[in-house]
């Protein structure tokens, strides 16, 4: 067992008290990214090592693995703590997204170690989609590279506002201040083109030697700023979803018996209280909250990020994929949108193609109307293209088969983010972020008979797990 962990548990008065203390710590999700061999895995290994998060058996195994697979001579190869795939160890690179957890006295952390190779950019986008902060590693010998620009742009595109530029391998440039200053200036010049209001910080460090990672470096007395760990422990993460209006995508209709009907899911943004008036989209039918049910019992109020089940005072027709929001909020379902796309498939994305798209719990079909442009990551300029290739990033116009309740991604990632699914292979082939909504008129609805409408309502009410589509779409009334 980790000796430090055992001491922490003892100081808290036992396992239960320690677990309660952990629950009350704030959580920071961050990723490490950069060009190939900039030291991402080594940095994470150093953080785990210097915060005493490594168990004795792991340390013993690391000594053995460093002799067989290590790239640091007689020193411990801390990257092997993270590079778990056999292919990664043999090639000395990171391929998959590796997640690690650690904590300090001030905060809990979830780290996503993302690949640096361009052909694995899709993996990097996956890792960035749930993070609040990005650590961008730059090799002090090489400076700002194309992949650094690519990862910076993807991070900001996916809504990350806090960037920590870690200028690594300072030991290989004799810890020179002028090298740090030059790279800092180069990156700030590039960052002027990045979208959004960003919080950018710079830390000179050596992940291999431990300089300015968890402790101040004696080799860089000219640097008076915080260490990387101090930045991670103190950065103020203001989540946009906390300030956004209530959004509750229904993931599951919970009906264990005839006396209970609840709507389960994770509150995407805002808050909800018992007694609050809400409405359901796409129908627009209103009701009020009777109960907020959780694993730990009923609550009077729930906040963004909580997994809850809502029980309403009225028996209305709601199924998986519907969206609940405050009754006084206006959100018009849209069939047309401009989407920022990160393409992840070998077959290019082209106009005329159709894909299944999944947004929260909603799944429907969409058609690609046009490729507006592709972003040139080297200079962030827009290029006219006929299709979007693997790892390409661009703006796409799309039409959905049915109206969807969408938000702008930068305002609400849950109700503004979607994935593309190949209809034949069921493989995820792309990620999309809603940029703009187009309120063009929808196609005239099909006229259904009274019998068809009644049958559809009965199926949706009594067999919600069938995920039957509402034939009346956004004009549907109460059941």
Swiss-Prot record:
Region of interest (G4), residue spans: 168-171
Keyword RNA-binding included in the entry's annotation: no
Region annotated G5, chain positions: 206-208
Enzyme class: transferase
GO MF, any single term: sulfate adenylyltransferase (ATP) activity
G2: region residues: 92-96
This protein's record includes keyword Nucleotide-binding: yes
Region of interest: G1: 34-41
Renumbered residue ranges of the record's region G3: 113-116
UniProt-listed GO biological process terms: hydrogen sulfide biosynthetic process; sulfate assimilation
HAMAP family: Sulf_adenylyltr_sub1 (MF_00062)
Membership in a protein family: Belongs to the TRAFAC class translation factor GTPase superfamily. Classic translation factor GTPase family. CysN/NodQ subfamily.
PANTHER family: TRANSLATION FACTOR
Function: With CysD forms the ATP sulfurylase (ATPS) that catalyzes the adenylation of sulfate producing adenosine 5'-phosphosulfate (APS) and diphosphate, the first enzymatic step in sulfur assimilation pathway. APS synthesis involves the formation of a high-energy phosphoric-sulfuric acid anhydride bond driven by GTP hydrolysis by CysN coupled to ATP hydrolysis by CysD.
NCBIfam families in the cross-refs: CysN (TIGR02034), PRK05124.1 (NF003478), small_GTP (TIGR00231)
Protein name, entry field: Sulfate adenylyltransferase subunit 1
Source organism (scientific name): Salmonella paratyphi A (strain AKU_12601)
Lineage per the UniProt record: Bacteria, Pseudomonadati, Pseudomonadota, Gammaproteobacteria, Enterobacterales
Name of the gene this protein is made from: cysN
